[in-house]
């Protein structure tokens, strides 16, 4: 089968564009995963991950998507009937709740309007109401809505309780401020394919001493491939994974992490913030209403409402087929109502400006009267920032 892969500009909230040097790393020779060479590669990759997570906690690499890490976080800590407080501000917060239910736990939901963020005080109220909550889960950056949660402030609340604090940073690590140790995060998960700008297929997880105490006492664990104790044993004894890892994706992630650290976390976050401001300003200048509430807006993805009469499939079809630019649609009840532009990873000014220009052209082609040039307004923002 011949695969005709047309190179398109991925302006979706993952997977994101991958730098050439990262793609080239995947073409290195395959090595045995039970060799010293792979142990050295894995150890180096883990140490770089810890620098990006900003943690001294144990860190592990998983061959799987970010959902595998979410599953690992829940399956290793809960017993049947355990209560877990799930902060649900979008599709991925809901996924955490579904994982809890899959392992026969009791998902206590703090539901927040999609597009908004959770209030730390609301988390405190629920923790005060129940004295036996095993963990609190939250998604830092909800790509489904383009909104983010205040994980630092929520961490300040949760640290005063026995509950473990579990945070999904799949679409924020390497693009927004994450500090596992200072934010009191017990288990933090991420994926390779978003802000880190590596190909999809790897996930990472950090585990605190507080979390290990719970895991080691859990005699009702269900699972095999995602058993954290197995990962801990193999890494401590051999600097390996318990099961066959994706060797070539490890090469790729290692190089991607080099690029993150070379740019510097602070510089990288500021770049994401600039691009977010320019994207928002450009869309609003055209007359497009943003979806996420201003106080909660993500710096890695922007969500916007479709103007009346603009069909999702036609709009995104023009962008993809005519201009080779891919943006995302809405999920679940937001399908057909919003579109989402990812400006994460290695995305820069030219990608944002090109996307805004083509969004404007697509809207005009579909009969929408654009108020003013989004590109010009975005350029002004970029020049000021």
UniProtKB/Swiss-Prot annotation:
Presence of keyword Transferase: yes
Residue numbers of N6-(pyridoxal phosphate)lysine PTMs: 194
Transmembrane region(s): none
GO-annotated biological processes: glycine biosynthetic process, by transamination of glyoxylate
Coiled-coil portions: none
Keywords: Aminotransferase, Pyridoxal phosphate, Transferase
SUPFAM superfamilies listed in its UniProt record: PLP-dependent transferases
Pfam families reported for this sequence: Aminotran_5
Cofactor requirement: pyridoxal 5'-phosphate
GO molecular function terms noted in the UniProt entry: alanine-glyoxylate transaminase activity; L-serine-pyruvate transaminase activity
UniProt keyword Transferase present: yes
EC number annotated for this UniProt entry: 2.6.1.-
Family: Belongs to the class-V pyridoxal-phosphate-dependent aminotransferase family.
Name the record gives this protein: Uncharacterized aminotransferase MJ0959
Annotated source species: Methanocaldococcus jannaschii (strain ATCC 43067 / DSM 2661 / JAL-1 / JCM 10045 / NBRC 100440) (Methanococcus jannaschii)
């Amino acid at each position: 089968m011949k695969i005709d892969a047309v190179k398109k500009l991925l302006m979706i909230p993952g997977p994101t564009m991958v730098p050439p040097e990262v793609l080239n790393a995947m073409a290195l020779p395959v090595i045995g995963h039970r060799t010293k060479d792979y142990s050295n590669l894995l150890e180096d990759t883990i140490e770089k991950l810890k620098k990006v997570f900003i943690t001294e906690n144990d860190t592990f690499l998983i061959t799987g998507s970010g959902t595998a890490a979410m599953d690992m976080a829940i399956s290793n800590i809960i017993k049947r009937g355990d209560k877990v407080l799930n902060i649900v501000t979008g599709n991925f917060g809901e996924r955490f709740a579904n994982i809890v239910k899959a392992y026969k736990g009791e998902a206590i939901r703090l539901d927040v309007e999609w597009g908004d963020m959770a209030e730390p005080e609301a988390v405190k109220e629920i923790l005060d109401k129940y004295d036996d909550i095993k963990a609190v889960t939250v998604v830092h950056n909800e790509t489904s809505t383009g909104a983010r949660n205040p994980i630092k402030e929520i961490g300040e609340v949760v640290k005063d309780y026995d509950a473990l604090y579990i945070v999904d940073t799949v679409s924020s690590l390497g693009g927004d401020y994450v500090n596992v140790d200072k934010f009191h995060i017990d288990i933090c998960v991420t994926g390779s394919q978003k802000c880190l700008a590596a190909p999809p297929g790897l996930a990472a997880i950090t585990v605190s001493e507080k979390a290990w105490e719970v895991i080691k006492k859990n005699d009702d664990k269900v699972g095999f491939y995602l058993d954290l104790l197995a990962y801990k044993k193999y890494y401590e004894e051999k600097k390996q994974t318990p099961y066959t890892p994706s060797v070539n994706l490890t090469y790729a992630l290692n190089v991607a992490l080099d690029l993150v650290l070379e740019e510097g976390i602070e510089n990288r976050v500021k770049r994401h913030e600039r691009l977010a401001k320019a994207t928002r300003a450009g869309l609003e200048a055209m007359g497009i209403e943003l979806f996420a509430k201003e106080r909660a807006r993500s710096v890695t993805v922007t969500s916007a409402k479709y103007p009346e009469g603009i069909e999702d499939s036609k709009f995104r079809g023009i962008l993809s087929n005519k201009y080779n630019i891919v943006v995302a649609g809405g999920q679940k009840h937001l399908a057909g109502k919003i579109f989402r532009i990812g400006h994460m990873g290695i995305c820069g000014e030219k990608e944002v400006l090109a996307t805004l220009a083509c969004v404007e052209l697509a809207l005009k082609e579909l009969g929408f009267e654009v108020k003013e040039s989004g590109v010009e307004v975005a350029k002004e923002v970029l020049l000021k920032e």
